UniProtKB/Swiss-Prot annotation:
Protein name, as recorded: 3-hydroxyacyl-[acyl-carrier-protein] dehydratase FabZ
Pfam hit, one: FabA
One cellular component term from this protein's GO annotations in UniProt: cytoplasm
Entry-linked HAMAP family: FabZ (MF_00406)
Catalyzed reactions per annotation: a (3R)-hydroxyacyl-[ACP] = a (2E)-enoyl-[ACP] + H2O
Record-linked InterPro entries: FabA_FabZ (IPR013114), FabZ (IPR010084), HotDog_dom_sf (IPR029069)
Record keyword Nucleotide-binding present: no
Organism (species): Shewanella sp. (strain ANA-3)
Family: Belongs to the thioester dehydratase family. FabZ subfamily.
Keywords: Cytoplasm, Lipid A biosynthesis, Lipid biosynthesis, Lipid metabolism, Lyase
GO BP: fatty acid biosynthetic process; lipid A biosynthetic process
Lipid biosynthesis found in the keyword field: yes
Residues the record marks as active site: 54
């Protein structure tokens, strides 16, 4: 039995996600098991562009961006479940839905968010996932996320 972890650095992540600055919100994948789960991180710094207006005196990461980062983690898990190969050009996973989103505390500059997502089911290209975002082991956000596999014309 092997304890080898499946990881992804930023170079590998860029091969799977179409997002780029300022909307790429996953910095590293610490571990994943295709068809089961993925653990990724986002390092939150004061240099994030959204902190200029949210909020200048008391910077707080917008909750919708925490959810977007969680959705990006589910997209990575979906791709790794489909195949370990880099996806062909024009294949994307769209954020298709969200249920039971809850926010429990704020995320501030200096925090490191750990995203833990689990695949619940997949049917006809629609994946359903449960995700939690944690800072220092404390859940800051949880949600059920759906993503849809689509091929786009390039």
């Amino acid at each position: 039995m092997s304890n080898q972890m499946n990881t992804m650095d930023i170079t590998e992540i860029l091969k799977y996600l179409p997002h780029r600055y300022p909307f790429l919100l996953i910095d590293r994948v610490l571990d994943y098991t295709p068809g089961e789960s993925l653990h990724a991180i986002k390092n939150v710094t004061i240099n994030e562009p959204f902190f200029q207006g949210h909020f200048p005196v008391q910077p707080v990461m917008p909750g919708v961006l925490i959810l977007e980062a969680m959705a990006q983690a589910t997209g990575l898990l979906a791709f790794k479940t489909m195949s370990d190969d880099v996806p062909p050009p024009g294949v994307l996973y769209y954020f298709a839905g969200i249920d039971n989103a809850r926010f429990r505390r704020v995320v501030e500059p200096g925090d490191q968010i750990h995203f833990e997502v689990k695949m619940i089911k997949e049917r006809r290209g629609i994946g359903v996932f449960y995700g939690e975002a944690k800072v220092d082991g404390e859940v800051v956000c949880s949600a059920e996320i759906m993503c849809a596999r689509r091929e786009i014309n390039q």
